[in-house]
A protein has these predicted regions:
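N-terminal Rossmann-like NAD(P)+-binding subdomain of aldehyde/semialdehyde dehydrogenases
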Residues: 1-118, 311
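ALDH superfamily catalytic-core signature
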Residues: 14, 215-359, 422
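Rossmann-like NAD(P) dinucleotide-binding subdomain of oxidoreductase/dehydrogenase enzymes
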Residues: 108-251, 379
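A short hydrophobic/small-residue beta-strand
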Residues: 156-158, 333, 419
Length: 464
């Protein structure tokens, strides 16, 4: 079945590609396996030089690849350029730090002696071929945050990207090739979802990482579990954004707009549930709704556009279904809640939306809203805020706005999430681990924790 790239701003099919045949997939697996045998022996210096070159090339390509991303999945071109810059920065960070992150670890002399050894240490060795199943919403960043540490660790990668961003997927393969990495180090597999199982079950593939939906994560985890292969999953999120009385409410409301509307609202780490103390609720709600109304919806190729189209027609339909269900169940739409009139017949647009009077029996309370839709809650104290924040199947990240040290400590202690961001919005950075709990997945990306996920952590014990 052909793989098509469609412009979500107008529904135009830009390009189509033939999916790889079984023979072509086998060729890529053979190439990856052969490459790993030699690439795993390269030095950190050699790998860092290649990754630095890739970063330089990406910087030079920034405008071009930004336009590709925008036409493939609809993010504003300004945000696409920022994504490319972030990827280059992450490449340079891992090129600089990988050697220290994977340095041999030496137990204390006392522990070595107690074990009966003359010497002992822990070594981080590459695993082999890692399959990366990646989503469309950050088509460069999601891949680079896997590829940069994996390649620096001495692994090789196979990318099965989302089927609506094949141009970006092929660009990434070409980027690493132009940087000087051996051809089998990083390969894009233009395949449909049904072909993933065969690749993952292949004995040459030793591990998999997936960023995407819960159903996709369940499928990959099930197959990998059957084959006893390591996996890292980063799935959905419905992050709480809690505002307490000592917060700078004006700043919190301004950041809330960015946190909800970034990437057209299609971000797993976007704040989605806004939980506000009653003492500052009215002030926050007024500022937040005003900010959401002021967002410029339009052509994502225009420099002044804040919110472009959703990535697919089905994605918009799913979002509309959640909003309509909430309204039917008694929720109040404070702004938005419909397709913008100017784009009613062109593209997959949806107005920035704020909904209040949410109850816990509504679907919108339990499910992830993947688009520019915010739910607004009023609470009476911190206990109620934490309880409501944790009332979700997801546990990716969280935000709290307060200048009370005791509240910060309490929130960080009791929130069920992989991240806590105080007086700021959630954002990933190569120095800090990223990942979630509950149905948001398991394992970590980025930082020392991320690069070690796909390493064979080896104990070397030497006796007399």
């Amino acid at each position: 079945m052909p793989i098509a790239t469609v412009n979500p701003a107008n529904g135009e099919t830009l390009k189509t590609y033939d999916a790889l045949t079984d023979e072509e997939i086998e060729h890529r697996l053979l190439l990856a396996a052969g490459t790993f045998r030699t690439y795993r022996t390269t030095t950190f210096f050699e790998r860092a030089r290649l990754l630095q070159t890739a970063a330089d090339l990406l910087d030079a390509d920034r405008d071009d690849i930004a336009r590709v991303m925008t036409t493939e999945m609809g993010k504003p071109v300004v945000a696409a350029r920022a994504e490319a810059a972030k990827c280059a920065k992450a490449m340079r960070w891992y090129a600089e730090h990988a050697q220290e992150l994977l340095a041999d670890e030496h137990p204390s002399a006392r522990d070595v002696e107690d074990s009966g050894a003359v010497s002992a240490h822990v070594r981080y060795r590459p695993l082999g071929i890692v399959l990366a199943v990646m989503p469309w919403n950050f088509p460069l960043w999601q891949v680079v945050r896997f590829a940069a540490p994996a390649l620096m660790a001495g692994n090789v990668g196979l990318l099965k990207h989302a089927s609506n961003v094949p141009q970006t997927a092929l660009y990434l393969q070409d980027l690493f090739r132009r940087a000087g990495f051996p051809d089998g180090c990083f390969q894009t597999l233009l395949i449909g979802s049904r072909a993933v199982e065969g690749v993952l079950r292949d004995e040459r593939v030793v591990a998999a990482t997936l960023t995407g939906s819960e159903p996709a994560g369940r499928s990959v985890a099930s197959i990998a579990g059957d084959e006893v292969k390591k996996t890292v999953l980063e799935l959905g999120g419905s992050d709480p954004f809690v505002v307490l009385p000592t917060a700078d409410v004006a700043k919190a409301a301004k950041v809330a707009v960015t946190a909800r509307a970034q990437n057209n609202g299609q971000s797993c780490i976007a704040a989605k549930r806004f939980i506000v103390h009653t003492d500052v609720y009215d002030e926050f709600a007024e500022l937040f709704v005003s900010g959401m109304r002021a967002l410029r919806v339009g052509d994502p190729m225009e420099e002044n556009t804040d919110v472009g189209p959703l990535a697919s027609e089905q994605g918009r339909a799913d979002l509309e279904e959640l909003v309509d269900d909430a309204v039917e169940c008694g929720a109040t739409v404070l702004c938005g809640g419909q397709r913008p009139e100017a784009y009613a017949k062109s593209g997959w647009y949806y107005e920035p939306t704020v909904i209040a009077d949410i109850t816990q029996d509504m679907r919108i309370h339990r499910e992830e809203t993947f688009g520019p839709v915010a739910t607004l809650y009023r609470v009476g104290d911190l206990d109620e805020a934490v309880t409501l924040a944790n009332d979700s199947p997801f546990g990716l990240s969280s935000n709290v706005w307060t200048h009370d040290a005791a509240e910060i400590d309490r929130f960080a202690r009791d929130i069920e999430a992989g991240g806590v961001y105080v007086n700021g919005m959630t954002a990933s950075h190569p120095a800090f681990p990223f990942g979630g709990i509950k149905r948001s997945g398991y394992g970590r990306e980025l930082s020392a924790h991320g690069i070690r996920e796909f390493c064979n952590i080896t104990t070397v014990w030497v006796g007399a």
